[in-house]
Amino acid sequence: MARSLKKGPFVADHLLKKIESLNAQGEKKVIITWSRASIIVPGMIGHTIAVHNGREHLPVYITDLMVGHKLGEFAPTRTFRGHAKSDKKSRR
């Protein structure tokens, strides 16, 4: 079920404070966060946010098309190694 509109989007407080302070100073620094559940708001456009995927922080550059999505959507947590090739020679 979707979040109620009267509540507004969830953005972690510490992340919102960092974004607002960087916007006030006019700086563009990489912001490290573990908050994958935070929703991207228009104030984040143009910033690079390093989102934790369980092992490392992956840098994500925020564009206008990402607004409304969650930060965790852009930092995959699982590595796909590929399916095993069908080796018919070894079966015989």
From Swiss-Prot:
An example molecular function term from Gene Ontology annotations: rRNA binding
InterPro entries: Ribosomal_uS19, Ribosomal_uS19_bac-type, Ribosomal_uS19_CS, Ribosomal_uS19_SF
Gene3D superfamilies reported in the protein's UniProt record: 30s Ribosomal Protein S19, Chain A
PROSITE patterns according to UniProt: RIBOSOMAL_S19
GO terms of biological process kind: ribosomal small subunit assembly; translation
RNA-binding in keyword set: yes
Short name of any one Pfam family annotated for the protein: Ribosomal_S19
Keywords: Chloroplast, Plastid, Ribonucleoprotein, Ribosomal protein, RNA-binding, rRNA-binding
GO cellular component: chloroplast; mitochondrial small ribosomal subunit
UniProt subcellular location: Plastid, Chloroplast
Transmembrane regions listed in the UniProt entry: none
Similarity comment: family membership: Belongs to the universal ribosomal protein uS19 family.
PANTHER family found in the cross-reference section: RIBOSOMAL PROTEIN S19P FAMILY MEMBER (PTHR11880), SMALL RIBOSOMAL SUBUNIT PROTEIN US19M (PTHR11880:SF8)
Function: Protein S19 forms a complex with S13 that binds strongly to the 16S ribosomal RNA.
Protein name: Small ribosomal subunit protein uS19c
